Amino acid sequence: MQIKKAEFVKSASSMSGLPEDGRPEFAFIGRSNVGKSSLMNMLLGRKNLVKTSKKPGKTVLLNYFIVNDSFYFVDLPGYGFASRSKSEQDLWRVVIEKYLRTRKSLADIFLLIDSRHGILPNDEQMIEFLDHYQIRYTPVFTKTDKLTKTELSVAKQKNQGSFFVSAVSGEGKDQLLDYVEQTLNAGDKKE
């Protein structure tokens, strides 16, 4: 798949603020600072379209980006960042859970996992939530440029069926975009 056009559309703090045009959505979720925004920029071929930060917890809204005028990438707030107030964390948990459980136009969820650390307890909780509600998701291991060849080979053996990407080197970009295209062509939306 070739990305010809990508634009920021809107940020939303609740379900009522989400686009209502029914276009397929690919949500990016993972721990704070796992590289969601950097990965989206790499996939979209735009260095600064999606705001990035070295400081965890930068994304605090559901951020929508229209791609090729036909589908959305949705940057979700990261989980596991404790410097936010408990009430703010609880509010976001409710909004994100409702989005993941009820959004009809959600084509897939990319669950991002830092390849250096593997699946951590917060990731396990998200996987359990997604499995419990039978929500389709695709594991994507990020920051593969930080691994040695041997470490990467072991990670790929342990996590077959997952994608392995680097926003720095571009590794995995074509495979992930091909997957997006296949999903769109199959019309495989959440029922």
Predicted ranges, named:
Residues 58, 71, 78-81, 116-118, ...:
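Conserved nucleotide-binding/hydrolysis micro-motifs of P-loop NTPases
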Residues 89-93, 120, 170-173:
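Amphipathic alpha-helical transducer elements in NTP-driven molecular machines
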Residues 68-106:
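Conserved nucleotide-sensing/catalytic segment adjacent to the nucleotide-binding pocket
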Residues 13, 44, 97-104, 131, ...:
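Signal for well-folded cores of large energy- and translation-related assemblies
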